[in-house]
Design a protein with these regions (language model features):
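Phosphate- and divalent-cation-binding pockets in alpha/beta enzyme and binding domains
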Residues: 47-48, 82, 124-125
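Alpha-helix capping/helix-boundary segments
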Residues: 9, 44, 79, 101-102, ...
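Acidic catalytic patch
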Residues: 68-91
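Acidic, PIN/NYN-like endoribonuclease modules and their adjacent C-terminal/linker elements
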Residues: 103, 109-144
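Short, well-structured N-terminal submotif of metal-dependent ribonuclease cores
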Residues: 1-39, 50-64, 129, 140-144
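Short active-site oxyanion
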Residues: 33-38, 68-71, 108-113
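Short, flexible loop segments at the rims of nucleotide/cofactor-binding pockets, characterized by
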Residues: 15-17, 90-94
């Protein structure tokens, strides 16, 4: 089991004023206390590298966290097959390609918690995997 961060969860770590920053940090601290990996798909990083200032902040964050149980999971053929399988099982188009990366990183570990700002799409992708929990970064709004 591992904690997996999607792009918005990583963005929260880059901005101390982000509403989910504290929630993500607490989850990372809990994972470390339990000696669990914190995973980020490198495909997720592609969503975040958006210019010099942001790139530097992201690289600094990754450097700070790298020695402390952080797993940067590259997309090799094995992960690519898993991502393709997730999309196929969910009857999803390539529009969910980026969302499939963090789910795949959790699935390959045998399960985990994925923190995300997009719980509906990730829950759709993770539906066949009972050991993957999708944790929304923001509380759900009540529907009327």
């Amino acid at each position: 089991m591992r904690l997996v961060l999607d792009a918005e969860a990583v963005s929260a770590l880059l901005d101390p004023r982000h509403p989910a920053e504290r929630k993500v940090r607490r989850a990372m601290e809990a994972a470390r206390r339990l000696r669990r990996e914190v995973g980020i798909a490198t495909g997720t990083l592609a969503e975040l590298y958006r210019g010099a200032g942001r790139d530097q902040a992201l690289d600094a964050l990754l450097a700070r966290e790298s020695g402390d149980g952080l797993l940067l999971r590259d997309t090799d053929r094995t992960l690519a097959r898993l991502i393709g399988a997730l999309l196929t099982e969910a009857h999803a188009s390539s529009a969910l390609f980026a969302d499939a990366h963090p789910v795949a990183v959790a699935v390959e570990a045998g399960g985990g918690v994925v923190q995300t700002a997009d719980p509906d799409d990730l829950a759709r992708l993770a539906a066949p995997y009972r050991t993957v929990v999708i944790e929304p970064l923001a509380p759900r709004r009540s529907q009327r």
